[in-house]
UniProtKB/Swiss-Prot annotation:
Gene from which this protein is expressed: malK
SMART domains registered for this protein in UniProt: AAA
Name of the protein in its database record: Maltose/maltodextrin import ATP-binding protein MalK
Record localization: Cell inner membrane
Family as reported in the entry's similarity comment: Belongs to the ABC transporter superfamily. Maltooligosaccharide importer (TC 3.A.1.1.1) family.
NCBIfam families assigned: PRK11000.1, PRK11650.1
PANTHER family reported for this sequence: MALTODEXTRIN IMPORT ATP-BINDING PROTEIN MSMX, MALTOSE_MALTODEXTRIN IMPORT ATP-BINDING PROTEIN MALK
GO CC annotations on file: ATP-binding cassette (ABC) transporter complex, substrate-binding subunit-containing; maltose transport complex
Length: 371
């Protein structure tokens, strides 16, 4: 195991900057996930740690050693890519041992390492098979095993589940989580799938246009996003946003006017520092935090546009006339409602988020479970 530290790391190709002044501390044994939309720089950041991309400026440390100029083979890292990249003419055992053979390891060491890793990954009964005889999930386990036999200090995974179908992704996600708990290795995992990030990570790094938007535990990012970008990216369906105007402030409270014909006002339990009366802001509320109208004091009403019945839950898209945008309401179980019907939902102030015009969040003061 080893820690990884990035200090003011920047990557640029000519005048195009793809990673901007990145500062990160990844502790020994942590499972850290880099997540963000396509083009945000997450894979580039991983490749700089691996040594596959040079660092334009800043410093990278693995353990206590500065690694900027160290060749990839000497960094003590192992990498798994989206593509399995297995040799089709070699057996599972031969694929897993290929790197050790190139390194000149003794046969008994190779056999011991391959057999040990095969047991961990439940591949022992498949060691004699060729890749074409394996399922997608088994091939990905072989690719992971090939990296593990080299005993890297840091394990890097670049979107390893993207080529798998939905059921296999769930299965492999569970297996990777179990593998980390069993081995205790430092793992850095890249994905654009925020569900993978939420379920796997000890710590999530959200990237936006080459910058670190927020670093934190999964529930911390879900309940207390630092800005509107993180709020909209973490969570599915994504957070609803409403334009509001500040009408009053008090200690640890901000009153806003909702964009409804009755101009209803509501006090939100958020930090009021630097919030000015009359300011235009955005109120955020997650679909699953909206309430049935009969148990709420603050009511929003609109026309049902789309009803998505998922069996275990219902997602209702409601158009609010005064703002000409849809809100998504999510409720467990089946909700029977027709498209075109008028539908009312409740807005719980304590579950609301408030964002300034520059996108930064006013700190929420409501204590959420698990954070």
């Amino acid at each position: 195991m080893a820690s990884v530290q990035l200090q003011n790391v920047t990557k640029a190709w000519g005048e195009v900057v793809v990673s901007k002044d990145i500062n990160l501390d990844i502790h020994e044994g942590e499972f850290v996930v880099f997540v963000g939309p396509s083009g945000c720089g997450k894979s580039t950041l991983l490749r700089m740690i691996a040594g596959l991309e040079t660092i334009t400026s800043g410093d990278l440390f693995i353990g206590e050693k500065r690694m900027n100029d160290t060749p990839p083979a000497e960094r003590g890292v192992g990498m798994v890519f989206q593509s399995y990249a297995l040799y089709p003419h070699l057996s599972v055992a031969e694929n897993m041992s290929f790197g050790l053979k190139l390194a000149g390891a003794k046969k008994e060491v190779i056999n011991q390492q391959v057999n040990q890793v095969a047991e961990v990954l439940q591949l022992a009964h498949l060691l004699d098979r060729k890749p074409k005889a394996l399922s997608g999930g088994q091939r990905q386990r072989v690719a992971i095993g090939r990296t593990l036999v080299a005993e890297p200090s840091v394990f890097l995974l670049d979107e390893p589940l993207s080529n798998l179908d939905a059921a296999l992704r769930v299965q492999m996600r569970i297996e990777i989580s179990r593998l980390h708990k069993r081995l205790g290795r430092t793992m850095i995992y890249v994905t654009h799938d925020q569900v993978e990030a939420m379920t796997l990570a000890d710590k999530i790094v959200v990237l936006d246009a080459g910058r670190v938007a927020q670093v934190g535990k999964p529930l911390e990012l879900y309940h207390y996003p630092a800005d509107r970008f993180v709020a909209g990216f973490i969570g599915s369906p994504k957070m609803n946003f409403l334009p509001v105007k500040v009408t009053a402030t008090a200690i640890d409270q901000v009153q806003v006017e909702l964009p409804m014909p009755n101009r209803q006002q509501v006090w939100l339990p958020v930090e009021s520092r630097d919030v000015q009366v009359g300011a235009n802001m955005s109120l955020g509320i997650r679909p699953e935090h909206l309430l049935p109208s009969d148990i709420a004091d603050v009511i929003l009403e609109g026309e049902v546009q789309v009803v998505e019945q998922l069996g275990n839950e219902t997602q209702i898209h409601i158009q609010i006339p005064s703002i000409r945008q849809n809100l998504v309401y999510r409720q467990n179980d089946v909700v029977l409602v027709e498209e075109g019907a008028t539908f009312a939902i409740g807005l719980p102030p304590e579950r609301c988020h408030l964002f300034r015009e520059d996108g930064t969040a006013c700190r929420r003061l409501h204590k959420e479970p698990g954070v």
